[in-house]
Amino acid sequence: MIDKPKLMAHLRTIPDYPVKGIVFFDVTTLFKDAECLKMLVDDLYEHYKDKGITKVVGVESRGYIAGAALALRLGAGFIMARKPGKLPAEKLSESYSKEYGTDSIEIHADAIDENDVVLIHDDLLATGGTVAATYRLVKRFNPKTVYMSFNIALDDVPKLDIYPRDAETYSILHLTEHDA
């Protein structure tokens, strides 16, 4: 069961970071509290335990924490979606735009197969640029199904046209920038 007031009390917000006009929701303060971290992972587990997830893709880097813990609970493999140049073997790459610049994301070329049911997990959904690129990248592997989950969704931030609205998405907390 989610205790939103407890999570909100542990969520740090930083105005004008990384650039002026952006409110940064720092989930690391949720992860350092054992009860908050357990609450997040337990909630995600309850939502996905019957979906047949075989791989969880954590998006660099804050998607790794709850994503890896959730993969362990689900009995699924864990895949790291990384920034360029961090993976040592053959990889696939996808570029994207975000609120304050452009980047790309990579996954090892042998990470996912067509029999997998994949859950992409990231800490926060803002414009959807990062997860859209990760979704496109995962879809290139032709898995059976792709789900997406987030610790936090910023509902008042407009999603980019490239955001995959056809994918089943779950967010634990729905916030606005006014919640900062």
Give the residues covered by each predicted segment:
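Active-site-facing substrate-recognition patch
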Residues: M1-I53
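Short glycine-rich phosphate-binding loop at a beta-alpha junction
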Residues: I53-E60
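Conserved acidic residues
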Residues: T54, D116, V146
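Generic enzyme active-site microenvironment
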Residues: G58, I120-H121
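Short Gly/Thr/Asp-enriched flexible loops that form oxyanion-binding sites at enzyme active sites
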Residues: I65-L74, A133-Y135
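Short, glycine/charge-rich flexible loops or terminal/linker lids adjacent to PRPP-binding catalytic cores
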Residues: G77-L119
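Conserved G/P- and acidic residue-centered "switch" motifs that form tight phosphate/ATP-binding loops
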Residues: D123, G128
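PRPP-dependent phosphoribosyltransferase catalytic core
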Residues: A132-A180
